[in-house]
């Protein structure tokens, strides 16, 4: 465990932001550099079958140390960080024995405040790792990588802990929805796996959104504004009308738990043509279909109102709820719960209001729920993680391996 924090602090200095407009895999050269460093570290640790493929996927195995058959299990984390905030020149800072109040982030005016982030009230006495207020931290998901590798390092050194074959993998471009695109499930050779990509201590997740992207294109008529009377149709005004027609109370800032939403995530505006990007989320497949139908109805309604100009909408499916693929294998969740309880961690089963590599992998034949990292406030400059949460994740990974081996000895 002694190498955990240093390992994490080293990993976050790699600039690995994924780039959604680059369709190569990985989408950024920083991920290639980080993947090479991880590949070399895994070789040095002495893991077996260490590989780095042309798409930047790193895989390795820890062979079984028991003399009876145990299904191979896997642990997965992703190397990229979110494009939503700067991920370059990350300068983590450690706050020891937090006792409440605002935490100054670096030398600027940014603070981490319990007023804005009430979870801090529950973390008195914990040791935190924060940003310096200028970048994200990268705990999502470099904490998961550090935790998996540290667990493998300890299991390699301590033969008294029984375990079957363990496969590990580190993927590129998860943050832009492509983490499973080139994942070789057959090569990974696990019966099931866990992504270590969750938040606070105890999180255990096997439900996620059904997801789609909607593109709304508004077509106008552009003319010289000096001669535009009764002729110009401003596509930006049409786009504004459409935005106001959407349900205001079904947006991310007004929803929680199992509630889905419409999220206007981007726009490209001009008089002649304006384009709106929405992400649609719902835990039920029928709910996602209903959201798409509502958008189609709003487009038809707006087209009827327009004397000139027109609107069209198209959809692209992103990922589906892994619940239907994980629930038929209840032992996967039960073993994770048992491992947490054995580590004095209370399991907190909740839906993922997002997606993980595990969601896609579950539909590729590798059931793959999600386990906590100990982190908070991902994708922004107020991201932080507790050292205690990271240590608990390492313990749970090792205990899961042990519990699985003992379960199949019986």
Swiss-Prot record:
Cofactor(s) demanded = Zn(2+)
Where does this protein chiefly localize? cytoplasm
Reaction(s) catalysed by this chain, per the record, are: Release of the N-terminal residue from a tripeptide
Location relative to the cell: Cytoplasm
- Which CDD domains does its entry note? M20_peptT
Q: Example GO biological process term? A: proteolysis
Matching PANTHER family:
PEPTIDASE T
Q: What is this protein called?
A: Peptidase T
Q: Which organism is it from?
A: Vibrio cholerae serotype O1 (strain ATCC 39541 / Classical Ogawa 395 / O395)
């Amino acid at each position: 465990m002694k190498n955990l924090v240093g390992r994490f602090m080293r990993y976050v200095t790699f600039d690995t932001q994924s780039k959604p407009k680059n369709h190569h895999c990985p989408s950024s050269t920083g991920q290639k550099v980080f993947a090479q460093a991880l590949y070399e570290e895994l070789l040095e640790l002495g893991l077996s079958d260490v590989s780095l493929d042309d798409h930047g996927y790193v895989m390795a195995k820890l062979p079984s140390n028991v003399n009876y058959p145990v299904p191979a299990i896997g642990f997965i984390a992703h190397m990229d960080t979110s494009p939503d905030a700067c991920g370059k020149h990350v300068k983590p800072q450690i706050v020891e024995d937090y006792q409440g109040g605002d935490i100054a982030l670096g030398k600027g005016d940014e603070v981490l405040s319990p007023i804005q982030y009430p979870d801090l009230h529950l973390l008195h006495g914990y040791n935190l790792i924060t940003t310096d207020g200028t970048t994200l931290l990268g705990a999502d998901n470099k904490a998961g990588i550090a935790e998996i590798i540290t667990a493998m390092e300890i299991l390699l050194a301590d033969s008294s802990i029984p375990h079957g074959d363990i496969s590990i993998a580190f993927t590129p471009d998860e943050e832009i929805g492509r983490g499973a695109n080139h994942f070789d499930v057959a090569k990974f050779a696990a019966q099931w796996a866990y992504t270590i990509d969750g938040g606070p201590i105890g999180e255990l997740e096997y439900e996620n959104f059904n997801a789609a992207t909607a593109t709304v294109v508004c077509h106008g008529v552009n003319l010289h504004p000096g001669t535009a009377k009764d002729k110009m149709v401003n596509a930006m005004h049409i786009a504004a009308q459409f935005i106001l027609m959407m349900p205001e109370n079904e947006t991310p800032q007004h929803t929680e738990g199992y509630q889905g939403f419409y999220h206007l995530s981007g726009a490209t505006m001009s008089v002649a043509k304006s384009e709106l990007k929405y992400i649609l989320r719902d835990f039920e497949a029928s709910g996602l279909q209903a959201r798409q139908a509502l958008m189609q109805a709003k487009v038809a309604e707006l087209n009827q109102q327009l004397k000139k100009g027109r609107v069209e909408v198209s959809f692209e499916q992103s990922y589906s709820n892994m619940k239907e693929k994980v629930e038929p294998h209840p032992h996967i969740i039960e073993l994770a719960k048992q491992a947490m309880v054995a580590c004095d961690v209370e399991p907190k089963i909740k839906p993922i209001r997002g997606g993980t590599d595990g969601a896609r992998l579950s539909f590729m034949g590798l059931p793959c729920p999600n386990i906590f990292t100990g982190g908070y406030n991902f994708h922004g400059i107020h991201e932080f993680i507790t050292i205690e949460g990271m240590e608990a994740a390492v313990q749970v990974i090792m205990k899961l391996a042990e519990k699985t081996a003992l379960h199949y000895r019986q």
